[in-house]
Amino acid sequence: YEISLGLVGSEMCIRDRYTIGYDTAMNTVVEMVDKLRDTCHSHDRCSVVEVMGRNAGHIALNTGVACGATFVLVPELPYDLDEVAKKMLETKKTGKQNFIVIVAEGIGHSELIAKTLEAKTGIEARATILGHVQRGGSPTLRDRVVASEMGYYAVELLENDIGNRVVGMQQGKIVDFDIQEALSMKKPFDEKLYQISNTISI
């Protein structure tokens, strides 16, 4: 299901990975992390990047995979900074000199995480909180098209005196749900993708 609410973190959703604004937010984060990586590369440092999502780690996870982050920390799963530090040191032995750690805002404490990793590894680490810049910018093609489709469907519902509905997408088709039902929907965390993200990194 894809629920057509403007939630950049894609917190409310079942099965699929999409709410309006999510694709735009992810692309914004990827662009900014790519720029931070350039700085990390020139200064041989670790960048701890905190991204939005409230208590959902979907933005952190997907952008972490897209950016080849060294490690991704999300509120859905426990984490161990000793393991993060160990991975940094192991990859440093292979010649890698820069590291990206993506932190979901549901975890927070990015400054403390950066200081802890620097103390454990001896690698200079800096925290960057992207904040509300993730909510701005021009929407991506996907956000524009899906928002138009769902908006059109919503107007049709209103024209037929049907209210208190949330428009979504099921198996590629536009559908609608009772608003209370939609509010109770939560998107399951993709643990397999999380495993992939922390196994392969650039």
Predicted features and spans:
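Catalytic, metal-anchored helix/loop core of enzyme active sites in primary metabolism
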Residues: 116-120, 136-148, 155-159
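Short gly/pro/ser/thr-enriched loop/turn and capping motifs at secondary-structure boundaries
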Residues: 10-11, 79-81, 132-136
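Short, small-residue-biased leader/transition segments that mark boundaries at the very start
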Residues: 1-3, 7-14
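Accessory alpha-helical/coil subdomains and C-terminal extensions
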Residues: 20-124, 128
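Phosphate-binding loop/pocket of nucleotide- and phosphate-handling active sites
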Residues: 165-202
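Short beta-strand elements at the ligand-binding edges of bilobed clamshell
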Residues: 15-24, 138-144
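A short pocket-lining beta-strand/turn micro-motif at the edge of beta-sheets
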Residues: 124-126, 162-165
